Amino acid sequence: MSATEEENVLVFDTTMKKKKKSKDSAAQTEEEKKKLKSKTLAMMSQQEDEQEQEDEKKEKRKKKKAALLASTEGENSEAIEKLENEGAHDEDIEAEFMGEKKKKKKSSKSSTTTTTSTTTTTTEPTETEPTEDGESKEKTITTSDGDTFVQGTIPWAGTDRDYKYSELTYRIYHLLQANNPDLISDQKRTMKPPQVMREGTKKTIWANFAEICGTLNRKVEHVYNYVFAELGTNGSIDGNQRLVIRGRFKTSQIEIVIRHYISEYVACRNCKSPNTVLERNNRLYFLCCNACNSKRSVAVIKKGLEGAGKKAPKEQS
């Protein structure tokens, strides 16, 4: 094997091997251990003596403070501060001498630092009691930020300052409650589910079709044209105002069709209110909302499935 091949082969690192300890080195280590023990014991005794001295100084300071507090507070407040400063100064000198850093004790009369924390702006309305004359004061609202303003008034009127988040949110809810309370309330408008039954093997009857059209405030012809277009079939209305649909359909399928019809032709896309009206203008249908007065055009319903008749025979020339 050549020299170049020996260099490429992995070789153990000799520095990582453990060296054998001689007898002389073992004796030296024992002597060093004894010296370290003696040094540590001396250091421990010094620290105990220093701790006792510090405790004695603290007791003397406490006695001086108690004696000074017994006299007038105004005259002796400066003397107390001097004693505290002297004690802190002595501790700093001792810490520097020993090479140890000690934390300074905060005085009880130090200025309190104000910590800012993010808090949610919640409004707490407080109603005032009526006065002796019988006139009740105006309702004031206080927020967690400390802002106070009278209900029904604009606090930034006549000023050039920026709006506050709490003021704007309060104004939004106040206007909604005054103009459209249905949007704030948790009440939900409910509608009866469709009552679907089968008649024979090829027909499905929707029993409460006329009732659902009344709750949606839409014409019967407009609704069943949409139903036939979505289901891809046709049908008619019998004498009991029931919708007869050709084919076999489940209740879940009818419910999906009703939801699509409500989202497209009943519900307002701005305020989600069902209080809307369909108006026709120049062959186009417009959905007008009575709550927010918005207006949008809706798609024309395509016709449902139509039966294909026989083609007329071509004329022979």
Swiss-Prot record:
Biased amino acid composition, Low complexity: 109-125
Alphabetized Gene3D superfamilies for the sequence: 3.30.30.170
One cellular-component annotation, GO: cytosol
Alphabetical keyword list: Cytoplasm, Initiation factor, Metal-binding, Protein biosynthesis, Zinc, Zinc-finger
Record field: compositional bias (Basic and acidic residues): 79-90
Biological process, per Gene Ontology: cytoplasmic translational initiation; formation of translation preinitiation complex
Localization: Cytoplasm, Cytosol
GO terms of molecular function: mRNA binding; translation initiation factor activity; translation initiation factor binding; zinc ion binding
Disulfide partners: none
Superkingdom field: Eukaryota
Annotated zinc fingers (C4-type), start-end: 222-246
Keyword Protein biosynthesis part of the UniProt annotation: yes
Any Pfam family the entry gives: eIF-5_eIF-2B
Subunit relationships: Eukaryotic translation initiation factor 2 eIF2 is a heterotrimeric complex composed of an alpha, a beta and a gamma subunit.
Function: Component of the eIF2 complex that functions in the early steps of protein synthesis by forming a ternary complex with GTP and initiator tRNA. This complex binds to a 40S ribosomal subunit, followed by mRNA binding to form a 43S pre-initiation complex (43S PIC). Junction of the 60S ribosomal subunit to form the 80S initiation complex is preceded by hydrolysis of the GTP bound to eIF2 and release of an eIF2-GDP binary complex. In order for eIF2 to recycle and catalyze another round of initiation, the GDP bound to eIF2 must exchange with GTP by way of a reaction catalyzed by eIF2B.
Name used for this protein in its record: Eukaryotic translation initiation factor 2 subunit 2
Encoding gene, per UniProt annotation: eif2s2
